[in-house]
Amino acid sequence: MHKNILSRSLATAFLFGLTARMNAQELVVRIDDMGCSHSANVASIDTYRNGIAGSVEVMPVCAWFPEAVKMLRENPGLDVGVHLTLTSEWENVKWRPLTHCPSLVDRDGNFYPMMNAHKAYPGQSVKENLSGLKLAEVEQEFRAQIELALRHIPQVTHLTGHMGATGFTPEVNELVKRLAAEYGLSSIDRAGSAEDYSFQYVGYDGPHGTLEEKKASFIGTLKKMEKGRRYLFLDHPAYDDAEMSTVFHVGYENVAADRQGVTDLLKSEEVKNVIRERGIKLIDINALTKQLPRQEATKKLAKAADKYIEAVAQAKQDLHSIMVVKDGKVVFEKWMGSGKENEPHVLNSVSKTFTSAAVGLAISEGKLSLTDKVISFFPDKLPAQVGEHLSALTIRHLLTMNTGHEKDPSKLRNTEKDWEKAFLHTEFPRQPGTIFCYNSLATYMLSAIVQKVTGQKLVDYLYPRLFRPLGINNVRWQESPTGVNAGGWGLFLKTEDLAKMGLLLLQGGQWQGKQVLPADWVKEMSSAQVPCVPAGRNSDALPQLMKNAKKSDWLQGYGYQMWRCRHNAFRADGAAGQYIIVIPEKNAVVATTANIGNMQAEIDLIWKYLLPAL
């Protein structure tokens, strides 16, 4: 009886949670001007780690940008925007463009101090000099700022404008919109962005000179937020220190004290309590602009979800999260146990599917082919005598786990420092292509090869090509002792990121009208290329194992780092219950994170309860 009550409570909590999410107020707390000073840099990280800030805008033209880069790379969970800059407002510190653009600067070569006319700075505003402004120079400068940020900061997701730089004329507004699309970024602060992304800018609901006024006015704003709506609040944290005490412009002289107040506001426990009490959900700009759409589940699916959660509890499965996407919209999501919505989860061998995507992209760019010989990439790591089987080993053999090994050599990574050399020095008793043996070190070799031919680690190669277009951020991937991403394991992503990847595969590599992964590669990687058996066995055992094929999702065929499933589905999976399950006949994706040893039992519950309701 107690177990049934617990199970129903969990199910009710899920349904309540989904409804609450769809009706919650969502708030982005954005902090601007990172890079303009050391004080702003430190305060930005402080208000992210210890406060409510979720997105930060960085200024590549400023002197403290290199320090900002270092700090942001140490905090990959902080969402970053490029704060496009055409003005330099402070009296005692100035910044200049990255490119030669005479129409954008004053006689000293600095950006003008103001965007709009200011009586203290006659003739020194962008708008007062519009007649001489060249749009081509604006584009040139914006491109330089964007590319500098993208080169150094992986988690850049969007563009914003310093002092209105992204929308001060219709032509500039359209330019920014075009650049954002070209670079795969969202664009905030231009005309129409609030409507495009369905949010509302909010500020202080009253006086905000002192800290107490800031808190009272900001809490007033929080209390006026309506359920089901999304909001964006921005301000500029820094410290009241010796550095900031020298910073001012006419009309804004108390910069240091004011920005210390912003820092204190964003870290205020009183403010945090109001946010919790009112059920306000803090998100970042990446989520605001690239989150998957939500839709209330059908009655049939809601009932099935109830039964599924109850069955998970009864089976004592340690499920951390599950997300179901149907017809491109999230219809079922839940986090439990140690699973957290906004924290990346270890994916184990789900990592392999992302490595396969990188290989497909490298092939499409002419950097690789399926028939390339593995030994050609590592001439300095080969054994003294290269055998016939090793000589025959190709990229395709690595992808299909048909390397010629009879046993998985992956444990070598626990004792060896040079994993490429260790792999190449193993015995290859069979002809490659004749035996399936699950082999994580083979996937590592794919990662090493991609790094060889692209000059980039897997994660850096995938950011502009896959992660950024899908809005996947805060990516972490473990590395080998020689600095190569593990490839076959060690990737950390959020549950929604898994769902996005599944949806991309379901859509044949297309995302929002663009071909992100080659369609033919998606078809090949998700098709049965070779017969397969569960990890720990090799295909010599296949005749015996096939007697239970109707009940097993590990005997349906293997593609390029993906498994075929029953029900004409395919999947990425990782040890302990990590799944991306793509079900084309239902136009659906199921993503899970977990700590479940019996993964067949885990997927069986999905087939039993959720599949019929999709």
Task: Enumerate the predicted regions with their spans.
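Active-site helix/loop module of the DD-peptidase/beta-lactamase fold
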Residues: E365-T403, H425, T454-W489, L493
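Active-site Gly/Thr loop motif
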Residues: I472-N474, S526-V589
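Active-site-proximal alpha-helical segments within enzyme catalytic domains
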Residues: A442-I449, W489-Q510, Q578-A594
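A short, well-structured edge-of-sheet supersecondary motif
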Residues: I309-G339, I581, N587-A591
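C-terminal domain-boundary segment and adjacent tail
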Residues: G184-R190, G251-L292
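Acidic (Asp/Glu)-rich catalytic clusters
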Residues: S44-N50, E67-D79, P97-D106, L150-R151, ...
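Active-site SXXK
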Residues: G328, H345-T371, L398, L446-V450, ...
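Catalytic domains of cell-wall/extracellular-matrix polysaccharide-remodeling enzymes
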Residues: N129-K215, I219, K223
